[in-house]
């Protein structure tokens, strides 16, 4: 168990609410609780009592619960005071908790410090700790379910299973190296090659699932780009199901970006409506157009809206030529309801009517397809970019190990080293091999009371 100094913080969100919670964590809080509340508390029981200032003035009244370590969130002794959720009351209650713990060196908790202590005290691994933040930040039911799956250990179990198999394979290599006089090829005897192939296949599956988990967690930055009056704002409103952006027949109405988050099959998409792209003498509109190009540069996907009644417009050709080659682009021809005959759209484009709602379901499906979302392979857990990088690194090291294993004159010490590096990459996901700098970066993104 950790022997760090005790910490305290308000654990509920800022603002007014029916209930507010102040949380304290530290080693051996029995005497502290007695001094703060004037009585002992039975662990894991709710006690209704007054919360008093040092001079006996009643600050509030509510429920006190004592969780004795190591059977607590942080693995240390934890005290939670549940009172009324007014900011002034909670600030006074927190100040009283810190005052009562002054002799113990109690201080205000840093962001994420309660969860960091839970990690350091082996109450959860690093992937589970990240899932706590993801659950708090989840903006859809699908994301919340994925975060809960990670928090319950489903992702970590997959990592630990792969790690265990790599360690076993490495043990066979070391045995072959350490006992050459036995004339036993442990790698051949225990079918090391099929084991290695199976590991690579399972890692491929895990990498694909991680990509799905990243999309579910982070969503995509989708920019609507095109000339003025091609229907970008109308499309934003149609996708959002609300009048988010102003729509008029006047060219140049949108002069700054408008961002709206929508969900398609639980996947968050951050749709950005932008100023129409054209040559203009208007200073304000020019600023908006410059911002549009900046948004285009940072987009995950670009919807290039064009007027279906004027295909092949020279300005659309110029815009297409300027769009970044590294970013997926979908040409969307709007106003198909105004066409008098069946028009032949450009290959790999889509026709819609934002005003009439035509083609929007196909557009939603194409957005998910271009994002790489596969509903049939939905990740049961959320993932982060660092998880994907670690999984890919582990896979790369196994590929190199396979090359060493395939040679007649196998270089077993290099084979063993690649297995070690693969195992280390996987272990960085759960925090068994993780730098202090990375831990600081992860936990600093938490709210203070968590």
UniProtKB/Swiss-Prot annotation:
Its main location: cytoplasm. Homodimer. Heterotetramer of two MnmE and two MnmG subunits. InterPro entries: G_TrmE, GTP-bd, GTP-bd_TrmE_N, GTPase_MnmE, MnmE_dom2, MnmE_helical, P-loop_NTPase, Small_GTP-bd. Binds 1 potassium ion per subunit. Its cofactor is K(+). Coiled coil: none annotated. GTP binds at residues 229-234, 248-254, 273-276. GO terms for biological process: tRNA methylation; tRNA wobble uridine modification. Residues 219-372 form the TrmE-type G domain. It comes from the Bacteria. Keywords: Cytoplasm, GTP-binding, Hydrolase, Magnesium, Metal-binding, Nucleotide-binding, Potassium, tRNA processing. The gene is mnmE. Mg(2+) binds at residues 233, 254. Exhibits a very high intrinsic GTPase hydrolysis rate. Involved in the addition of a carboxymethylaminomethyl (cmnm) group at the wobble position (U34) of certain tRNAs, forming tRNA-cmnm(5)s(2)U34. (6S)-5-formyl-5,6,7,8-tetrahydrofolate binds at residues 23, 80, 123, 450. This is tRNA modification GTPase MnmE. Its EC number is 3.6.-.-. Signal peptide: none annotated.
């Amino acid at each position: 168990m950790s022997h760090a100094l005790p910490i305290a913080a308000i654990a509920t969100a800022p603002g007014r609410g029916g209930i507010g919670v102040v949380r304290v964590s530290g080693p051996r809080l029995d005497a502290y609780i007695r001094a703060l509340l004037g009585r002992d508390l039975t662990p894991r029981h709710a006690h209704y009592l007054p919360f008093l200032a040092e001079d006996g003035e009643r600050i509030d009244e509510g429920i006190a619960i004592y969780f004795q370590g190591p059977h607590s969130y942080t693995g240390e002794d934890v005290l939670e005071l549940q009172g009324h959720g007014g900011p002034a009351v909670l600030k006074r209650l927190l100040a009283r908790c810190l005052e009562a713990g002054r002799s113990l060196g109690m201080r205000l908790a840093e962001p994420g410090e309660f969860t960091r202590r839970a990690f350091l005290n082996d109450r959860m691994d690093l992937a589970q700790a990240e899932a706590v933040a993801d659950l708090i930040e989840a903006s859809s039911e699908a994301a919340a379910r994925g975060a809960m799956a990670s928090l319950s250990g489903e992702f970590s179990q997959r990592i630990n299973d792969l790690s265990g198999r790599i360690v076993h394979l490495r043990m066979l290599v070391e045995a072959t190296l350490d006992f050459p006089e036995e004339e036993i090829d442990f790698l051949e005897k225990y079918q090391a090659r099929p084991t290695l192939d199976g590991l690579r296949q399972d890692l491929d599956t895990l990498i694909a699932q991680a990509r799905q988990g990243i999309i579910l967690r982070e969503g995509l930055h989708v920019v609507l780009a095109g000339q003025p009056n091609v229907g970008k704002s109308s499309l934003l409103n149609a996708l959002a199901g609300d009048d988010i952006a102003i729509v008029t027949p006047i060219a140049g109405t949108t002069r700054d970006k408008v961002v709206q988050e929508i969900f398609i099959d639980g996947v968050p998409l951050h749709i950005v409506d932008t100023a129409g792209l054209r040559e203009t003498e208007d200073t304000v509109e020019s600023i908006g157009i410059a911002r549009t190009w900046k948004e285009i540069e940072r987009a995950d996907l670009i919807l290039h809206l064009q007027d279906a009644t004027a295909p092949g417009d020279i300005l659309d050709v110029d815009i297409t030529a300027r769009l970044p080659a590294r970013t997926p682009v979908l040409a969307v021809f709007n106003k198909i309801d105004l066409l008098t005959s069946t028009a032949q759209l450009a290959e790999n484009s889509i026709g819609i009517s934002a005003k009439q709602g035509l083609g929007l379901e196909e557009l939603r499906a194409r957005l998910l397809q271009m994002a790489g979302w596969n509903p049939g392979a939905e990740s049961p857990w959320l993932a982060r970019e660092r998880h994907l990088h670690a999984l890919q690194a582990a896979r790369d090291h196994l590929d190199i190990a396979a090359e060493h294993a395939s040679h007649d004159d196998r270089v077993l010490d290099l084979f063993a080293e690649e297995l070690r590096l693969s195992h280390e990459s996987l272990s960085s996901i759960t925090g068994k091999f993780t730098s202090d700098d990375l831990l600081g970066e992860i936990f600093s993104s938490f709210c203070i009371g968590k």
